[in-house]
Regions:
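Hydrophobic residues within beta-strands of alpha/beta enzymes
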Residues: 90-91, 111, 134, 281, ...
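Active-site loop/helix belt of alpha/beta enzymes
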Residues: 2-3, 165-390, 463, 490
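The start of beta-strands in P-loop NTPase/AAA+ ATPase cores
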Residues: 89, 132, 156, 279, ...
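Active-site-proximal loop/turn and secondary-structure-junction residues that shape catalytic pockets
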Residues: 73-75, 96, 117-119, 138-140, ...
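A charged N-terminal "starter" segment
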Residues: 1-157, 192-248, 271-273, 277, ...
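Conserved, mostly hydrophobic/aromatic
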Residues: 45, 72, 94, 126, ...
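General structural feature for long, well-ordered alpha-helical segments within catalytic domains
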Residues: 25, 41-44, 48, 52, ...
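Charged (often Lys/Glu-rich) extended helix/loop segments that serve as interaction or gating elements
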Residues: 351, 355, 359-524
Length: 524
């Protein structure tokens, strides 16, 4: 059993109060691999990747599901092999990510290329390697991809990223489906009345899905009748006396989508169909989202786009990718997404709206990153300066209680190995890892070694009152966006990543050295 639910499954506390990972103490790991140190429980990476693949398949048990691992969360050759063996594809968005995945032996057909500013070289490599999908992110990109594909004498598989207008995510920087940001092509015209899309909620209410309903299957007279009426050719003749008010509202919504930028780009892709194969549409609404509500709203809009494109162009988009953003808990008691429950809710909603629209089942795809790897990682630090600071009467803790003293515990890492607290205000916790410690505790703030007052590792945590220089602190849930967002700020060296399982502990990504820093500086 892990220490608490937020710690890796292979972690424990021994009789001496030491944190262990598959039997190895934190002290022994730092002695062998150095400090700071990223520790990744590779057995749990495998288990969580398999779990998501299985949960998606079980939830959408009447259609095909694809799951891609978002490589931006944590990428190495070993991680690539683990997640692909678990049944995942891999999302990449730079030449570096592409090359690491290919070097790991991942075939192109298991890779996806994202990015809002892809280079010609990245596009060419993805086409040459036969990537499963290139995700188009802006209106001029289809022509660029088509030109490169034509030059290479190949046909590229492409998907359009659509900004649905659904806002989700815990921070503005990770909310990615509103219109005023850099990703994707808008679903609706800029002056459109998005409230007209509320008709999609009425559709769900009209034909509720049973737990065993098939995507695209009509259920009863209401579903069949609606599906038949909406096979009228665009731009819909709504003059028929049997057309209901609900039908008129749906026609208005479809007309609005038909006039939108996303559908225009889909049409443009089809104009290049000799070298571009249009495989679907993509939606990513944000990050660290706790339930399926926003995913359901975005999915409904993607299904409406799919129906509208069928009506205008007689083309059924084969796949709808609903992106990533599935949350994990970073501190004990924090909310996290129950994948089985929330994917089940999402499946029911997608089933229902497709039945109401009379559309066949698309392939449903997902892109988890954080969910698969964040809880598998722990960062180990050596404690340096321990500084009690007296505070005035206005200071409070996060619960609002008065605080008269805070202990600043400095460690040998910081924002160079985990930028998330500084960038997003992300909350973490920490635990003394090398001994039991005193029963008395003090209110502490764990801070890094960098020349920034915002260099905070853990904003608030109670640690043993006898914490001292040389102790080891362990910070859990650092498996995602720690190493991949690390920097050399203050010329700090990026720590090693060590993979650990039941059988061994080994270096996955080596620690940087001073020789590395000096070798990169080629000036005279």
């Amino acid at each position: 059993m892990p220490i608490t639910p937020i710690w890796p499954a292979g972690s424990a506390v021994n009789d001496n109060g030491e944190i262990t990972f598959h039997g190895r103490t934190a002290e022994s790991l730092l002695d062998e691999f150095g400090s700071p140190l990223y520790v990744i429980d590779t057995d749990e990476v495998r288990a969580r990747a398999s779990k998501f693949v299985t949960s998606a398949s079980n939830a959408f048990n009447n259609t095909v599901t694809h799951v891609s691992f978002a490589g931006k969360a944590l990428l190495s050759k070993e991680i690539c092999r683990i997640v692909t063996e678990a049944g995942m594809l891999i999302d990449t968005c730079t030449m570096g990510e592409m090359r690491i995945a290919l070097a790991a032996g991942v075939p192109g057909r298991r890779l996806v290329l994202h990015g809002n500013n892809k280079s010609d070289e990245e596009i060419a490599l993805s086409i040459e390697q036969g990537f499963a999908k290139i995700v188009v992110d802006e209106p001029n990109e289809p022509a660029r991809i088509a030109d490169i594909a034509k030059r290479l004498g190949k046909r590229a598989r492409v998907m359009l990223r659509v900004t649905s207008g659904i806002h989700a995510g815990g921070h503005e920087f990770v909310s990615t489906a509103h219109e005023d940001q850099k990703f994707g092509v808008a679903l609706l015209p800029v002056d459109a009345d998005a409230s007209k899309l509320s008709v999609l909620d009425d559709l769900t209410d009209v034909t509720p899905a049973g737990s065993n309903a098939r995507l695209g299957e009509q259920s009863g007279e209401a579903g069949s009748d609606r599906a038949l009426r909406y096979d009228i050719k665009y731009p819909y003749d709504m003059s028929h006396e049997k057309v209901s008010e609900g039908d008129r509202k749906l026609a208005e919504a479809m007309t609005m989508v038909a006039d939108g930028p996303a559908l225009a780009v889909l049409k443009d892709i089809q104009r290049h169909q000799d070298v571009l194969e249009l495989v679907g549409v993509h939606s990513h609404i944000g990050s660290n989202i706790h339930d399926a509500d926003a995913f359901i709203q975005a999915a409904k809009r993607m299904m409406l786009l799919r129906k509208t494109f069928y009506a205008t162009d007689a083309y059924t988009l084969p796949e709808v990718d609903l992106g990533g953003g599935y949350s994990v808990a970073y501190t004990d008691g924090e909310d996290s997404m129950d994948i089985d429950v929330e994917l089940g809710r999402l499946a029911d909603a997608v089933t229902t709206v497709n039945r109401a629209l009379g559309m066949p089942a698309p392939v449903i795809s997902f892109e988890p990153g954080r969910w698969a790897v964040a809880p598998t990682g722990v960062t180990l630090y050596r404690v340096g300066t321990v500084k009690p600071v007296r505070l005035n009467g206005d200071a409070t803790d996060k619960a609002g209680n008065p605080v008269h003293e805070r202990v600043y515990v400095s460690v040998d890492g910081g924002m160079s190995d985990n930028i998330r607290p500084a960038l997003y205000g992300s909350d973490y916790t920490a635990r003394l890892a090398n001994r039991k410690g005193s029963d008395d505790t003090k209110l502490c703030r764990v801070v890094g070694m960098h020349c920034e007052s915002g260099d905070i590792v853990v904003n608030e945590v109670r640690l043993p009152a006898d914490i001292t220089r040389g102790d080891i602190l362990a910070v859990p849930v650092t498996g995602a966006y720690g190493r991949t967002m690390a920097s050399n700020y203050n010329q700090a060296l990026i720590p090693a990543v060590v993979g650990i399982g039941e059988t061994d502990a080994h270096v996955m990504i080596r620690r940087q050295s001073i020789d590395d820093l000096l070798s990169w500086d080629v000036s005279r």
